[in-house]
């Protein structure tokens, strides 16, 4: 690219997790000063968020050119991030997924129960934690986790959650599912699947302990799901496994997010914008 590009032209990458400093390593300074990351969130047709990552050698003028173009011409909500693994959205979002699976297994929740809490009651998509994994692709999770984990300190809360996943056997569950072709919606299924029975498609969910599938039900026996309609406080204070699950996941995720300023970005507003 550097050999054929126009002089002073701006080059950007759509990587979602790889630090910019790794991408420009070994490249001439004349290229590095024109190189930024423009991470479009998927699917870009519907999601407005766009993360921009630059380096010290990139001028504010060029950052502003890219930022204004993405804002005014593409209609994106631009968030300026520091050059750290996963930037803002994926750093916090993948931690939420990690700790969501960890706490679900610890509390003995079914995938339906976990997703019923980590969906609409907290203002997230109804897919929740496990359903989201199916949408993204379970085969991508190990790669993203490894990429993030290897670039973060051992004592980072992210890596602590990774170790908990390994200890609880979640990593093994994912590996077995992927090996069997259960990579999510693009494969035979994931934590949820559609099974044909007498010509009818029946939605089934995976038992996290046995690995077996059984008919899935939209209704879960957690009163906290109903309590969540009154707000987050009512949800996290509700005295059942759902309320406890919500508190543990949200409190840890919010604590982690707060601890990352100013590492991942210079102000807390950008953290809220990226979630």
Features from the language model and the residues they span:
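N-terminal glycine-rich phosphate-binding loop for ADP-containing cofactors
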Residues: 1-275
């Amino acid at each position: 690219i550097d050999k054929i590009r126009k002089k002073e032209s701006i080059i950007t990458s759509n990587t979602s997790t790889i630090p910019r400093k790794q991408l420009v390593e070994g490249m001439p300074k004349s290229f590095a000063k024109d190189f930024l990351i423009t991470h479009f969130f998927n699917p870009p047709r519907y999601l407005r968020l766009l993360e921009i990552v630059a380096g010290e050698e990139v001028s504010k003028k060029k950052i502003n050119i890219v930022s204004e173009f993405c804002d005014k011409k593409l209609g994106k909500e631009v968030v300026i991030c520091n050059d750290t693994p996963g930037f803002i959205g994926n750093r916090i979002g993948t931690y939420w997924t990690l700790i969501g699976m960890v706490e679900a297994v610890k509390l003995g929740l079914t995938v339906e129960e976990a997703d019923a809490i980590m969906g609409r009651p907290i203002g997230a998509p109804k897919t929740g934690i496990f359903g989201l994994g199916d949408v993204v692709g379970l085969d991508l999770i190990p790669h993203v986790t490894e990429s993030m984990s290897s670039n973060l300190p051992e004592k980072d809360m992210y890596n602590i959650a990774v170790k908990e996943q390994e200890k609880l056997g979640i990593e093994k569950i994912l590996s077995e599912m992927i090996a069997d072709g259960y990579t999510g919606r693009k494969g035979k299924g994931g934590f949820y699947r559609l099974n044909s029975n007498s010509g009818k498609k029946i939605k089934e969910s995976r038992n996290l302990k046995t690995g077996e599938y059984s008919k899935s039900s939209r209704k879960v026996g957690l009163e906290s799901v109903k309590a969540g309609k009154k707000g987050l406080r009512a949800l996290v204070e509700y005295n059942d496994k759902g309320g406890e699950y919500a508190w543990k996941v949200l409190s840890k995720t919010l604590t982690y997010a707060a601890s990352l300023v100013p590492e991942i970005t210079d102000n807390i507003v950008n953290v809220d914008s990226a979630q």
